[in-house]
């Protein structure tokens, strides 16, 4: 079952990216390195509800 998630920047707490994931394959929270336009660099983004 795929669910929609929001990715939040760990440095500035900006919620920039929307994505989806399969809960059966990835039960824990997703962490990705993505570009943050507010910081103007690549930062760690964590999954939020």
Swiss-Prot record:
InterPro entries: Ribosomal_bL33, Ribosomal_bL33_CS, Ribosomal_bL33_sf, Ribosomal_zn-bd
Top-level taxonomic group: Bacteria
Entry protein name: Large ribosomal subunit protein bL33A
GO biological process: translation
PROSITE patterns for the chain: RIBOSOMAL_L33 (PS00582)
SUPFAM superfamilies: Zn-binding ribosomal proteins
Gene Ontology MF terms: structural constituent of ribosome
Cellular-component GO terms for this entry: cytoplasm; ribonucleoprotein complex; ribosome
Protein family: Belongs to the bacterial ribosomal protein bL33 family.
Keywords: Ribonucleoprotein, Ribosomal protein
